């Protein structure tokens, strides 16, 4: 059986990076991979294990075909390295921090992907965005508005609520992976 792409998505501040970090050790121990995405954000940005590059470098990587998936959101460009294709061919499950707005394009490239939507109560989301201090109030409001516009109603995806316990959410994600519940 081949590997699966587990496409984790959710609003900025929903806890995707925290969740990926919480499951990292067990996913790697089971032979899976968690992808470090490329983002046009300063490498000093708090809270995300990503490779920060300049917009010019991102465009160069894109032109070189370095990305299996790429998109733009919230004024930034994001890329998933092409290396994921090798891991999937090798039979490894691969977790990525994806984008709700790019899900349809990701499904076209990876029809068997497992879409996982991380949800969080709106008041919790606002509090998390304010606490991390990475965006201005205007940017936070724009992110909250984008979250309200991208509900993914009717989409075939697993939903995990991360409003409370990260440990419980991590266990739920690991159960999905183990049971191949997305298949």
From Swiss-Prot:
InterPro entries: GK/Ca_channel_bsu, P-loop_NTPase, PhnN. Its EC number is 2.7.4.23. One of its GO terms (cellular component) is cytosol. Pathway: Metabolic intermediate biosynthesis; 5-phospho-alpha-D-ribose 1-diphosphate biosynthesis; 5-phospho-alpha-D-ribose 1-diphosphate from D-ribose 5-phosphate (route II): step 3/3. The keyword Transcription does not apply. Keywords: ATP-binding, Nucleotide-binding, Transferase. The keyword Transferase applies. GO terms for molecular function: ATP binding; ribose 1,5-bisphosphate phosphokinase activity. Gene3D superfamilies: P-loop containing nucleotide triphosphate hydrolases (3.40.50.300). GO terms for biological process: 5-phosphoribose 1-diphosphate biosynthetic process; organic phosphonate metabolic process. It comes from the Bacteria. It catalyses: alpha-D-ribose 1,5-bisphosphate + ATP = 5-phospho-alpha-D-ribose 1-diphosphate + ADP. It holds the Pfam family AAA_18. Belongs to the ribose 1,5-bisphosphokinase family. NCBIfam families: phosphon_PhnN, PRK10078.1. Catalyzes the phosphorylation of ribose 1,5-bisphosphate to 5-phospho-D-ribosyl alpha-1-diphosphate (PRPP). PANTHER family: GUANYLATE KINASE-RELATED, RIBOSE 1,5-BISPHOSPHATE PHOSPHOKINASE PHNN. HAMAP family: PhnN. This is Ribose 1,5-bisphosphate phosphokinase PhnN.
